[in-house]
UniProtKB/Swiss-Prot annotation:
The keyword DNA-binding does not apply. HAMAP family: DHQ_synthase. The gene is aroB. This is 3-dehydroquinate synthase. NAD(+) binds at residues 71-76, 105-109, 129-130, 142, 151. It comes from Streptococcus pneumoniae (strain Hungary19A-6).
Length: 355
């Protein structure tokens, strides 16, 4: 299946197909002329797929080198970026060459940032290997790295030339790594896609059920992401809906220490906490918090952060990228399948941190 991201200045396709990673070279040859390519990946993904993708690209006529770094959210920083820059220079990459981001969200965000800044921008593509990356972070052009202050605080908007999604690679994920991706999938059902929510309701929450329906879950999620990105590429309007649960979720990730709480886990906890307070304030319908909580728990996602410290979470919120002055754009769900922006002051956000 192909999903077109029809952005006027940089349209591209998401290709979703079981087993398609084996044809990565043929796919890339349709996008780029043979040239130098650097695969950016982490050490874990490299051990599984780097050689397979490298050989496929070489068979298609590309000159290929591989750069891998230690896996983990804590490596998504400017220190790693500098190391990639140095590798690209040693390989002699020019503006006519490109980067293949092969990995999960950390790899995709970092490699995209490198591509968008090296020599003021070179071409790149995404081959996401985690569920979170396949349904969310590989699509839409947000790149970035973390700082000690906030997640993705340094970044760019830079669209890839294509996204290649192979649902079969999810079978090599650990249980926790697969389940955390369901945080984003559940979010899509809540903010835009009642049909997806109904599908999730019908699943029993097991790893087997996720893998069996992975292609459908990915397609639904990508369609929602496509709509938001095409209408609002630079995150000034409808695309903000994608941040449901992320305001508190990012604060949890930052205060826990990057890599301690996985992104989808933090999003799940953020959705539940925001919904609980918003429901109490009459801003979200009665019973929706229970529905979200039960859905997250069914798939094994955490719904409560055990190291909850209001002062530290609040400090992290002050660095939120969606803040405008002293106002945050909080995303709420007034009814299943729709979202809205509710501006709140930083002071009022303290209410949303009360357990």
């Amino acid at each position: 299946m192909k999903i077109r991201i029809d952005i006027p200045h940089h349209p591209y396709d998401i290709q979703i197909e079981k087993g398609c990673m084996a044809q990565a070279g043929q796919w890339l040859r349709e996008l780029w002329q043979p040239q130098k390519v650097v695969i950016v990946t982490d050490n874990h993904v490299a051990s599984l797929y780097a050689e397979k993708v490298k050989l496929s690209l070489e068979d298609a006529g590309f000159q290929v080198a591989v750069f891998d770094f230690l896996e983990g959210e804590e490596r998504k920083n400017l220190t790693t970026v500098q190391k990639v820059y140095e590798f690209l220079v040693k390989q002699g990459l020019t503006r006519s060459d490109g980067i293949v981001a092969l990995g999960g969200g950390v790899v995709g965000d970092l490699a995209g940032f490198v591509a968008s800044t090296y020599m003021r921008g070179i071409h790149f593509v995404q081959i996401p290997t985690s569920l979170t990356a396949q349904v969310d972070s590989s699509i839409g052009g947000k790149t970035g790295v973390n700082t000690p202050f906030a997640k993705n605080m340094v970044g760019t908007f830079a669209q890839p030339d294509g996204v290649l999604i192979d649902p079969l690679v999810l079978e090599t994920l650990g249980k926790r790594e697969l389940i955390e991706g369901m945080g984003e999938v559940i979010k899509y059902g809540l903010i835009e896609d009642p049909e997806l929510w109904a599908l999730l309701t019908g699943l029993n929450g097991s790893v087997e059920s996720i893998l069996e329906h992975a292609e459908t879950l990915i397609e639904h999620s990508c369609q929602v992401k496509r709509k938001m990105v095409v209408e609002d590429e630079l995150d000034n309007g409808i695309r903000l809906y994608l941040n449901f649960g992320h305001t508190i979720g990012h604060a949890i990730e930052a205060t826990a220490g990057y890599g301690k709480v996985m992104h989808g886990e933090a999003v799940a906890m953020g959705m539940v906490q925001i919904s609980k307070v918003a429901e109490e304030k009459g801003l979200m319908p009665a019973g929706i918090t229970q529905s979200i909580t039960e859905m997250c728990q069914k798939f094994g996602l955490p719904v409560d952060y055990e190291n909850w410290k209001v002062d530290k979470l609040y400090q992290a919120l002050t660095h939120d990228k969606k803040a405008r002055g002293n106002t945050l754009k909080l995303v709420l769900v007034p009814e299943l399948g729709s979202a809205t922006i509710h501006p709140v002051s930083l002071e009022e956000m303290k209410d949303y941190l009360v357990k």
